[in-house]
């Protein structure tokens, strides 16, 4: 539930738009020339060496976290992890699995299929009995994981989702969706029946957790409620935070189009309809991050007030257009213009938002007043979050401002509205019928500006990894925070005093980065596949 970072954005894989364009792109670049044999051999050798390091030296029972020090003495997912832990949340274990399948598609080398199989073993072990996944799993067992939550997790001031162990699974941050999509892709590769039970459990988890109106909670199944600072437990609320509904619809569409499971059509359509019923009425036709069970906007974490969220509204408008292109039903377009008008009307005056940002993140229900988030104190024990109308000194780790491209939203709507339903649904798996369309060839490829195949080959070190900036560090756990506020100012920082285990930016720390691995492998895959645009 963190604010979208570049790592997290890039870890988000195929969206509904990709499903719609997969057929159109399937022949793209078919006339491109393959690289010379010698160059191709160099690329493939580099890929193999890097992946061998990953599978033989870095993986723990097939799973991965996000970042490692070169000597493996410390490692991190969204928080510092232990040696026996693997991270499910992207760009973690399942994301690496997607990359291995992509490499298999590019090279035909069964080594990468076997690497993907190792990842699947870790994910199947980590799968909750109900069928979903938590952010993290620990091969040392649940007792060890609970102890981690009660120490490292509990003291991450800004990471409230890690301060308590619920013992269930989460849709947050696409961990469940990423894992489920990977198992689907791996099963479809050779139809190996050993993956089908876990895949079926994941599908059933998405179906079982869906509310009758079509929305999904953040966590499932429901367990004993946990209160943070006196607030109700938000994890059962229907949520749009971090694209939960969009990810689940995407997964179900992928299953519908490949497995021939006709029963999935109804939950897909109900999931889409949930966007209609949760859109607020005039004069504030936007969406909240989450809702009560009677569909009223509600607070979640202590820095997510009851409000309408501008970035969520913009994302949901994009999805409404995609739903029209999937179904041809104009009801999904009916209220798009008024929501765009509303977003335009609440743009901040010049000079209020930082450069590149246009809107406040949170808008007060009933007033259109921007709500700006602040904090005081120095750790999870003595600190608190609050909001007011002051745009100065807002949080560093969760921006009070968002970039909303009104012009792009209007064009997206206009282009869709100009299409007839028949034109809009060309290539839609919901129109073509279940079990008809293939999935895209690649899922995990990331952009890598300025990186070439030659530079990627040259920069792989003798150990077999790309040394890269890790981007952040954290205080090792030393004990619970004090009730006394430490000297200093922590209102705009990513981390509090030395008891705060939340990661913080660090431009000096280098090591082994999953993101760097995926970016470099993406460059190399593009170099050997002539169907990829250059």
Description of each model-found segment:
Residues 4-18:
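Bacterial N-terminal signal peptides that target proteins for export
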Residues 33-53, 118, 157-164, 178-181, ...:
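Terminal, non-catalytic domain-edge segments
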Residues 17-28:
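Bacterial N-terminal signal peptides
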Residues 58-250, 262-266, 279-307, 351-406, ...:
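Extended ligand-binding groove/face enriched in aromatic
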Residues 205, 272-274:
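Extended amphipathic alpha-helical interaction segments
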């Amino acid at each position: 539930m963190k604010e979208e970072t570049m790592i997290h954005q890039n870890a988000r894989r195929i969206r509904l738009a990709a499903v719609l364009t997969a057929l159109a792109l399937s022949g793209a670049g078919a006339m491109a020339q393959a690289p010379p044999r010698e160059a191709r051999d160099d690329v493939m050798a580099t890929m193999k060496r890097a992946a061998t390091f990953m599978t033989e030296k870095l993986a723990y029972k097939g799973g991965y976290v996000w970042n490692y020090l070169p000597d493996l003495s410390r490692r991190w997912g969204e928080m510092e992890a232990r040696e026996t832990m693997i991270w499910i949340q992207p760009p973690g274990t399942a994301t690496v699995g997607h990359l291995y399948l992509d490499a298999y598609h590019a090279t035909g080398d069964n080594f990468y299929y076997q690497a993907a199989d190792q990842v699947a073993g870790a994910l199947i072990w980590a799968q909750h009995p109900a069928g979903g996944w938590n952010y993290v799993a620990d091969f040392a067992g649940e007792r060890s994981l609970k102890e981690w939550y009660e120490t490292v997790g509990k003291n991450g001031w800004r990471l409230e989702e890690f301060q308590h162990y619920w013992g269930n699974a989460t849709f947050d941050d696409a961990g469940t969706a990423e894992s489920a999509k990977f198992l689907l892709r791996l099963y479809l590769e050779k139809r190996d029946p050993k993956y089908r039970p876990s895949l079926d459990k994941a599908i059933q988890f998405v179906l079982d957790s869906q509310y009758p109106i079509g929305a999904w909670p953040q966590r499932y199944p429901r367990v004993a409620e946990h209160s943070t600072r006196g607030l109700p437990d938000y994890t059962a609320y229907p949520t749009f935070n971090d694209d939960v509904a969009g990810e689940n619809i995407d997964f179900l569409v992928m299953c519908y189009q490949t497995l021939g499971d006709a029963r999935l059509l109804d939950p897909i359509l109900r999931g889409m309809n949930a966007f209609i019923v949760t859109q607020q009425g005039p004069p504030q036709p936007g969406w909240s991050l989450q809702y009560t069970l009677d569909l009223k906007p509600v607070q979640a974490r202590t820095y997510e007030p009851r409000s309408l969220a501008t970035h969520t509204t913009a994302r949901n408008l994009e999805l409404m257009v995609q739903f029209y292109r999937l179904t041809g039903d104009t009801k999904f377009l009916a209220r798009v213009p008024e929501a765009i008008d509303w977003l335009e009307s609440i743009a901040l005056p010049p000079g209020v938002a930082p450069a590149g940002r246009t809107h406040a993140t949170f808008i007060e229900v009933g007033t259109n007043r921007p709500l700006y988030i602040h904090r005081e104190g120095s750790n999870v024990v003595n600190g608190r979050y609050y909001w007011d109308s002051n745009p100065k000194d807002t949080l560093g780790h969760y921006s009070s401002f968002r970039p909303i491209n009104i012009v792009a939203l209007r064009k997206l709507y206009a282009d869709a509205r100009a299409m007839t339903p028949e034109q809009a649904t060309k290539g839609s798996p919901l129109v073509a019928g279940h079990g008809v369309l293939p999935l895209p060839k690649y899922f995990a490829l990331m952009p890598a500006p300025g990186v070439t195949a030659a530079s990627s080959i040259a920069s792989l070190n003798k150990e077999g990894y790309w040394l890269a900036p890790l981007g952040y560090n954290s205080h090792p756990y030393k004990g619970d925070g004090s009730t006394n506020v430490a000297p200093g100012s922590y209102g705009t920082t990513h981390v509090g005093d030395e008891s705060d285990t939340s990661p913080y930016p660090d431009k000096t720390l280098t090591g082994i980065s999953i993101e760097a691995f995926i970016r470099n492998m993406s460059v190399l895959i593009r170099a050997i596949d002539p169907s990829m645009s250059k």
